[in-house]
Amino acid sequence: MPLSYQHFRRILLLDEEAGPLEEELPRLADEDLNRRVAEDLNLQLPNVSIPWTHKVGNFTGLYSSTIPVFNPNWKTPSFPDIHLHQDIINKCEQFVGPLTVNEKRRLNLVMPARFFPISTKYLPLEKGIKPYYPDNVVNHYFQTRHYLHTLWKAGHLYKRETTRSASFCGSPYSWEQELHHGAFLDGPSRMGEEYFHHQSSGIFSRPPVGSSIQSKHQKSRLGPQSQQRPLDGSQQGRSGSLRAGVHSPTRRPFGVEPSGSRHAKNIASRPASCLHQSAVRKAAYPNHSTFERHSSSGHAVELHNISSSSAGSQSKRPVFSCWWLQFRNSEPCSDYCLTHLVNLLEDWGPCTEHGKHHIRIPRTPARVTGGVFLVDKNPHNTAESRLVVDFSQFSRGSSRVSWPKFAVPNLQSLTNLLSSNLSWLSLDVSAAFYHLPLHPAAMPHLLVGSSGLSRYVARLSSNSRIINHQHGTLPNLHDSCSRNLYVSLMLLFKTFGRKLHLYSHPIIMGFRKIPMGVGLSPFLLAQFTSAICSVVRRAFPHCLAFSYMDDVVLGAKSVRHLESLYTSVTNFLLSLGIHLNPNKTKRWGYSLNFMGYVIGSWGSLPQEHIIQKIKHCFGKLPVNRPIDWKVCQGIVGLLGFAAPFTQCGYPALMPLYTCIQSKQAFTFSPTYKAFLCKQYLNLYPVARQRPGLCQVFADATPTGWGLAIGIQRMRGTFVAPLPIHTAELLAACFARSRSGAKLIGTDNSVVLSRKYTSFPWLLGCAANWILRGTSFVYVPSALNPADDPSRGRLGIFRPLLRLRFRPTTGRTSLYAVSPSVPSHLPDRVHFASPLHVAWRPP
């Protein structure tokens, strides 16, 4: 007969009918009892021939691929012009005085951030945009390309111009200015001969207004040649030939599209974004577009006498000028030929765009190192898209990078720190990752991009192949024409207009700010925000500021005080260049919602949406059916988050952990499901630890236990010898049960850790409930007053130690610590508290 739920509760000592704890609790460590209970509850994981269940509620397991949903109406989020103040340490010191060593070290880590992978694998451009949505390939291509363009315009990406130069938008940093090669320009007044000197260096420097000007007589690193003669049309801005002092008319920079022969003498060749694979590196691709240089003052400056009518120049263009514009001169192949689309506009705009600033970069191949694709911004916002960057090559294989570890505040640390009767609000940092600048030397390792529409479509279509590798073009221009492509492009034309042409060209971009797809980024963001919050805490010692990643919370004793603090802190953060989203500032009152918890003066509980997820999970959980271990992983992830708020905690989930480790199916018996259900439907807050003086001590030997409760000494023996850790845990349980003390001294590190998952299952569950809310203090064995009673010597009295317990915030980064805020609530349960049931010894 299977074990009933009520009988199981009695075995676990969760009911009041249990006998004396000193007799009942040691039985739970018995191997035979644990084995019999596991058999009765079907926890032994026998090999079952019944087919596994691969879906439970929202959890899917093996062999069930979730089809991602593409939204053709995704909006690309707008990104502010984020420019973190370069001299951020001095700005902070002006605000708060000298910074600590820890704060300086962390701020220096991100100004600029550096990235040193062991090795970098370069992938072909076709893998730049992942075919994540097979039914919406073209739409996804343009949406992703638009997202990348938006990031570049906002100054978060570099655009690779040539092998050794890149352009970007936004304000430059000093480490980027240092990479400029040659003299600076000073607006439109010096756009004549000196402008071409700059182009001859292959850098195309364009600094902002007011930047320092080097003397035009000063020698650049290129030597005097580049400043003594104007740039001829045949001279190419290729860094390799410039260093050699030779300008070859036959060698052109890879990825450059020079204009046709009619303009060859008028325009200096400039890098464009027509980037193909290495097989075509030496091929020249004529550029059709009219170049307009925008000076730092914002005026368009046309070079020499170039016609501004792109239509006129396009008609005399060679055959390989631009894949998109070739359709203009070709005969339509069908009703769905792209010629119809291209002829809708006279002026499709330039083939490529260039940033405001051009810098030298380390040698960067025409490849990508990671793929990108779009997903919903979050489960609650499906109208906007989010760019997912896959740089997983740096986290896999023999050359994987060991990312630095950093402290994640655990539940008890968070509760100790934030559980008070303060009034709270949380700040929303806009695009937090894109605040932290990367050194340009990291660009060759963090490359994203696309191969251009023609190659992308050809790669994904079954009847089109890229045969002419020499020119990287299709053997027949109209091979790519199809009804699906035509319809998709016509619909996209309404959204993107003439940008369809720009986005159809190849492009390679490197990250200028830290990307989200690299394990280094969370570490850097955590260091940065923790240092900033430390500065805020020192500036406002009567308040509390805390952050985890981009989640920043402020606490003050009154709402009026909090609003004043909010204004001051916001102004300080804005002065550093940190962008906040005021529309997403949330005022929480006295119950803070943070990291999935609700934290108030009574302690912490999971947020309501997590509780609802757990209820939904139990409603869908089948009994007596083997469930795929992959599904169990999802269930354990959800239940594990709320485990500290239950009676038996993590030990109750150990059968599921075991099944996942052995990659076996797990079958829920009705009793085990009812047990877990009861556990998770009654959640108890995790309370804030309070400082105190330890008056109760416990110790044990394999054969006996001893307690020291004030001046009282107790001892007892076990029926059979037990492992020492098990004996020490039993002694701690007896001390808690007999004294009711929430502070116990012990010399056992396993008991101190409060992790009871390695003990016999029944004992771990019962001990977790008995010791819930108990704090432990380490006492050396030689000084432990309970040491003698545990060895059977009651007559010897060692003096009680004055051991003070101070609640800790763990390894959480708190350099400037706010004074603790005493709770004004009495120790008894407040009428508004969700804590309805106080702990009773079993």
From Swiss-Prot:
Q: Where is the Reverse transcriptase domain?
A: 356-599
List the InterPro entries: DNA/RNA_pol_sf, DNApol_viral_C, DNApol_viral_N, HBV_DPOL, Rev_trsase/Diguanyl_cyclase, RT_dom, Viral_Replic_Matur_Polypro
Cite the residue spans of the region called Disordered: 205-271
Gene name of the encoded protein:
P
Where along the sequence does the record put site: Priming of reverse-transcription by covalently linking the first nucleotide of the (-)DNA?
A: Y63
Which protein family is named in the record? Answer: Belongs to the hepadnaviridae P protein family.
Designated name of the protein: Protein P
The EC number of this protein is 2.7.7.7, 2.7.7.49, 3.1.26.4
Classification via SUPFAM superfamilies: DNA/RNA polymerases
| Presence of keyword Mitochondrion | no
Q: Where is this region: Terminal protein domain (TP)?
A: 1-177
Its biological purpose: Multifunctional enzyme that converts the viral RNA genome into dsDNA in viral cytoplasmic capsids. This enzyme displays a DNA polymerase activity that can copy either DNA or RNA templates, and a ribonuclease H (RNase H) activity that cleaves the RNA strand of RNA-DNA heteroduplexes in a partially processive 3'- to 5'-endonucleasic mode. Neo-synthesized pregenomic RNA (pgRNA) are encapsidated together with the P protein, and reverse-transcribed inside the nucleocapsid.
